[in-house]
């Protein structure tokens, strides 16, 4: 599978500050994953896709409309999205015909190749978290209820605290008392400071106080939790827009990161969430959680296709160490792990 590494290496961006920081603490467990983690976390998705492709290999005679239809079906079942699935299928068939490929093992490798090429296209996203040096970096976490915003925020806080960075948590989920208590418990566990809402205080006011304190007291990071909100509730989306504008006004710049946390099991529903949240707050990236319970691993390609947004973090479970910076090569290898690429028999 060396061709994957070579293909990705050609398009890798220069090291960001976050990349350099990450390398300084490479002995820390958070955000470090090996191939096995991806294989286990994407097991359901890999099984779904492999079933289609391996069945296709048994019936394979030549490249025709039936072949394309079955390949398309396999990609759609992963929630790659219709547009992306069509483009990938067309590219695969074009390469098969151009190079007169008949060995299905080579076709399997070509499928992987074209998925990588499609995701990268003109460039490979830098999936590291944005970190501005000598600056109070404000991270805003948004999403619907129950996707894991608060837990994700705490895991990222843990990551930076282990680098001896000063981190301030802001409990902006004023709709749910449990969320405030949850984040407060995380603050105690991580031994970091937190801004809690006053009685009846609304989210925008809490965010204002938190960001101002973070800047005035020269914290390295201010991590802002927000209430879960459905994308079809206009009043709540308008409040999110107000929160975003408050951060801009207080800090003098946009948040370093505005991360939409998506439940990886919801598939195409996540795309409609991303569309609306991106309209009301300028998203910088996606965090996909609960991928260990999802058979829809192709959603990452659909997000890239529709919004040109990077998936920055991917979660495979509830433990602190189960959140990883998204690694394209490990992701693709995990997604296609059951394709039996080392087996020379169809």
UniProtKB/Swiss-Prot annotation:
GO molecular function: ATP hydrolysis activity; GTP binding; GTPase activity; signal recognition particle binding
Membrane association type: Peripheral membrane protein
Catalytic activity: GTP + H2O = GDP + phosphate + H(+)
Keywords: Cell membrane, Cytoplasm, GTP-binding, Hydrolase, Membrane, Nucleotide-binding, Receptor
GO CC list: cytoplasm; plasma membrane
HAMAP family to which the protein is assigned, alphabetical: FtsY
Name by which UniProt lists this protein: Signal recognition particle receptor FtsY
Native organism: Mycoplasma genitalium (strain ATCC 33530 / DSM 19775 / NCTC 10195 / G37)
């Amino acid at each position: 599978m060396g061709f994957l590494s070579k293909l990705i290496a050609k398009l890798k961006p220069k090291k960001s500050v976050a990349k350099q920081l990450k390398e300084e603490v490479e002995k820390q467990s958070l955000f470090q994953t090996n191939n096995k983690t991806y294989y286990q976390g994407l097991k359901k998705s890999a099984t779904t896709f492999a079933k289609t492709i391996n069945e296709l290999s048994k019936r394979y005679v030549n490249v025709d409309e039936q072949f394309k239809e079955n390949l398309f079906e396999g990609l759609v079942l992963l929630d790659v999205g219709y547009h992306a699935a069509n483009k990938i299928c067309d590219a695969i068939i074009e390469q098969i015909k151009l190079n007169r490929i008949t060995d299905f093992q080579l076709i399997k490798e070509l499928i992987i190749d074209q998925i990588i090429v499609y995701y990268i296209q003109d460039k490979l996203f830098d999936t590291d978290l944005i970190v501005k040096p000598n600056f109070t970096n404000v991270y805003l976490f948004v999403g619907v209820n129950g996707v894991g915003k608060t837990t994700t925020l705490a895991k990222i806080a843990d990551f930076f605290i282990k680098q001896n960075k000063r981190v301030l948590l802001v409990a902006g989920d004023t709709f749910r008392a449990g969320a405030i208590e949850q984040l407060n418990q995380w603050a105690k566990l991580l031994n970091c400071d937190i801004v809690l809402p006053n009685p009846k205080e609304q989210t925008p006011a809490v965010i204002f106080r938190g960001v101002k304190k973070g800047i005035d007291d020269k914290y390295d990071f201010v991590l802002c939790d927000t209430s879960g909100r459905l994308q079809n509730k206009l009043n709540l989306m308008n409040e999110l827009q107000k929160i975003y504008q408050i951060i801009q006004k207080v800090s003098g710049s946009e948040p370093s990161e505005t991360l939409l946390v998506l439940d990886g099991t919801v598939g195409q529903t996540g795309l409609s969430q991303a569309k609306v949240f991106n309209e009301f707050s300028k998203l910088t990236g996606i965090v996909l959680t609960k991928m260990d319970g999802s058979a829809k691993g192709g959603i990452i390609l659909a997000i890239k296709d529709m919004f040109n947004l990077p998936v920055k973090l991917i979660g495979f479970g509830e433990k602190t160490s189960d959140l990883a910076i998204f690694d394209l090569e490990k992701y693709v290898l995990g997604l296609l792990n059951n394709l039996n690429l080392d087996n020379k028999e169809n």
